[in-house]
Amino acid sequence: MATDTERCIFRAFGQDFILNKHFHLTGKIGRGSHSLICSSTYTESNEETHVAIRKIPNAFGNKLSCKRTLRELKLLRHLRGHPNIVWLFDTDIVFYPNGALNGVYLYEELMECDLSQIIRSEQRLEDAHFQSFIYQILCALKYIHSANVLHCDLKPKNLLVNSDCQLKICNFGLSCSYSENHKVNDGFIKGYITSIWYKAPEILLNYQECTKAVDIWSTGCILAELLGRKPMFEGKDYVDHLNHILQILGTPPEETLQEIASQKVYNYIFQFGNIPGRSFESILPGANPEALELLKKMLEFDPKKRITVEDALEHPYLSMWHDIDEEFSCQKTFRFEFEHIESMAELGNEVIKEVFDFRKVVRKHPISGDSPSSSLSLEDAIPQEVVQVHPSRKVLPSYSPEFSYVSQLPSLTTTQPYQNLMGISSNSFQGVN
């Protein structure tokens, strides 16, 4: 395996971040259930370039974590290039001299904040912002779905936003396959504790046919949250969440429940009698009527009646953004063959192989044998559409920089050293591979 002859070690989140020597860790962004994310500066660029570094410390901890890591790596590589999907620049895997894993690293495009921070902020949002965000989500979904992939974990925290209102979807670790032949679908990934507020009813009811409609439901929940500045469905658990949905949408038709619910769930729902539901107009007073019409089509209880991504893109609410040139499909479908691997040793080898296969693609010179790997060439890795606003993109009011990070962290424009503010220490670290 190739080795890097020189790296630097930074301390953050109580962990060693062992990085390519051309990166300087500058701040802590967040801690997820699967990874730790920091901001960094790439020192070899002519201009100051910021990159997000995501460390997965427990990538080989168990089969679920290993598959999630592999799924993330492969999908970010496959979907790389869409303007509304976060860009993966490079990958790395670092072991200590004793052979213990330090972590798998993903060097990603650094965005200023996530959509949940914007929603929770006091900043005034206009209807044009909502339209822009939903349109960009749908453009990305059309691309993702055309690759026979379901995201399965769309929520505001997984939607990254810049001050120019550009939005990008991230976190594909819980994605699953989709086919018109439902027998070959992998179904919703079980075994993870994730937010249920954006889960479609068919997932709550353990329906076996996971379709593109699950992501449309999540997008509807996000639209409702933008309009109301708070989540529409806030269940404490699966049962409570289902109750929240029923109280707003009302009791679904009997034939719908017979198709997607077990007999036990069917009996549970009908013990309440006929729940009338509430109008979206009463829940979201003052909202654009066209937004509410689209919302109703997205939050349809029956997944077969839910609006498709193609029809949603053509909805009148999004007409000011509708541009067929931005609504393109992925040219190649994604294959989830690795999902059927059960051996931890084989899964671990697949992760290592994926890391180094990707590095060969994005680094300036191929990595081979035991020769030192080449330095990153970030300028070569970044396409024009990542660093420039699309010429047809409409201009919206910018967001203030205070939303770049969570409240206790400085923004990217601060002149104060991040490591002094956040207790990040750095030292030279030689010979770690």
Swiss-Prot record:
Belongs to the protein kinase superfamily. Ser/Thr protein kinase family. It catalyses: L-seryl-[protein] + ATP = O-phospho-L-seryl-[protein] + ADP + H(+); L-threonyl-[protein] + ATP = O-phospho-L-threonyl-[protein] + ADP + H(+). The gene is KDX1. One of its GO terms (cellular component) is cytoplasm. Induction: Accumulates in large amounts when cell wall integrity is compromised. Coiled coil: none annotated. Interacts with RLM1. This is Serine/threonine-protein kinase KDX1. It comes from Saccharomyces cerevisiae (strain ATCC 204508 / S288c).
